[in-house]
């Protein structure tokens, strides 16, 4: 007798159930082979973000199978075998582990093949109503569908989602393939041809389940040719009460996502407040004088306007003038011994601190105050000093703004001062020591002002390394360029509180889609819908949907086969024999005014204006016929001569 544990084990069918990952993989391959590779003008969105298209699939090969086996012969099984015999599909089918998964893939692939049967009342198209710049898939009716009728071949496969799959799925991304079952009260993943049906608050279709893993779309009202087939995703799918919905019904009212244009949008606020305490560390400007600070102590609530542009002087000119001033000051000073000459920067630093409260730093009195007497012990420690070093380290204040460019101009200034070193060799020798106090306060000297966040130890190391001299010569070593300190800067990031305000019809005849010079908005001569033609040196006759339909079926949209025994129109089996551009006579009848400058106010093809002809179209027609007659007469004259 078998144990209870063996009896309670699940069956093979239940263990090998169709999962979300498997169904998503099947759907990506099926849409790649039978939608993207069937003369489709864009790429459909895949379920896996890192999906790689199947190699070995050619558009002409797939279209040939669909035309001869599905459209003409109406043999879905033969078309399925030929498609699976393609190199890329055969390679993918061989990777499936068992026969059960291969059977699941064949069933799912057959749903996409049936879309191309002549009796199918719909076809896949695109719309840019929701994103303007990107076209998303949609379902368009090409036959009249009465109310209550089940839309043929508009079906899909339904897979229940587990708790783990719900956590792994990125719910922040609006995935329109997730449906909530009203009977099971659980979310399910829904893929197949019906997944291309978009949402509408007044939808003309309804999703109904067929069996445990099937789903179908039923028409809730009459659907006419050219109308988009839509379903309802739920009451709160696009926010609370669908407040962000951009469907056609909301666009006509307008409401929800289209109602933002009625009132001005809220102003965006910065996500991080402006730094108040660290303003002195981040801004390179000097502090104001004490009187100005007292008068302007209350901070302004609004940001200040940017001042007018003031031309700055040349950096090279300022460096040359700096060198001349230093040379003149050296010659005017009393001669001192050049063996042990040094300067004290103590008082110069103090004067720099006191002068930092004003707008400009004055240079009066700094030369005489910086020379101080020192003790013999201090003179022994400064025996390595030379006249050139003391001249360079002399505290000379400048009327310059402490900008970031001051650090970069320090090296050229030092080289220019070093060139004046022979002038300082005649100075008499005295025991004067160079005393440098590591002050990090904002001061303006010859070596340029450092940032306020420089550490004291880095200041001492940089200045001490710059004052070392060679023992055997009196040449000045190149002063080490001060390191730029690493400061933490606060960058304000502005996050808009609301999305772009949408205006009804802003996705039609908008200049946002005209990326190149010769991109134009063109009116389709078959369905009267506006579309963007890139590089329109020659104007196309039909939109991408109508052109794809004629390439696959051999008839003009929405015709798929002969309408009866009295129909004499023959199917075009080779689409390359059709001229798909306007003739010069037809080009003269079309007005080029407003083809991308502004967008229309009517968003849908059935409500849009007719073909963009000029008011005097009859007169232009006669002129065109006259031009054609003249050309023919001229050609006859040439041949007779």
From Swiss-Prot:
Give the superkingdom in one word.
Eukaryota
GO cellular component terms attached to this protein's record? chromosome; nucleus
UniProt lists compositionally biased (Basic and acidic residues) regions at 608-625
Give the first-level EC class, as a single word.
transferase
Q: Where is the composition biased (Polar residues)?
A: 361-381
Any one GO MF term held by the record is: histone H4K20 methyltransferase activity
The record ties this protein, via SUPFAM superfamilies, to: SET domain
Compositional bias segments (type: Low complexity): 348-359
The EC number of this protein is 2.1.1.372
Catalysed reaction per UniProt? L-lysyl(20)-[histone H4] + 3 S-adenosyl-L-methionine = N(6),N(6),N(6)-trimethyl-L-lysyl(20)-[histone H4] + 3 S-adenosyl-L-homocysteine + 3 H(+)
Q: Name one Pfam family in it.
A: SET
> GO biological process: any one?
methylation
Q: Which InterPro entries match?
A: Hist-Lys_N-MTase_N (IPR041938), Set9_fungi (IPR025783), SET_dom (IPR001214), SET_dom_sf (IPR046341), Suv4-20/Set9 (IPR039977)
Domain annotation SET: ranges: 120-234
Cellular localisation: Nucleus; Chromosome
Record keywords, A-Z: Chromatin regulator, Chromosome, Methyltransferase, Nucleus, S-adenosyl-L-methionine, Transferase
For region Disordered, the annotated ranges are 261-388, 596-628
Entry's PANTHER family?
Answer: HISTONE-LYSINE N-METHYLTRANSFERASE KMT5B (PTHR12977:SF4), SUPPRESSOR OF VARIEGATION 4-20-RELATED (PTHR12977)
**Family the UniProt entry places it in:** Belongs to the class V-like SAM-binding methyltransferase superfamily. Histone-lysine methyltransferase family. Suvar4-20 subfamily.
As for what it does, the entry says: Histone methyltransferase that trimethylates 'Lys-20' of histone H4 to form H4K20me3.
From the Swiss-Prot or TrEMBL record, give the protein name. Answer: Histone-lysine N-methyltransferase set9
Name the species this protein comes from: Emericella nidulans (strain FGSC A4 / ATCC 38163 / CBS 112.46 / NRRL 194 / M139) (Aspergillus nidulans)
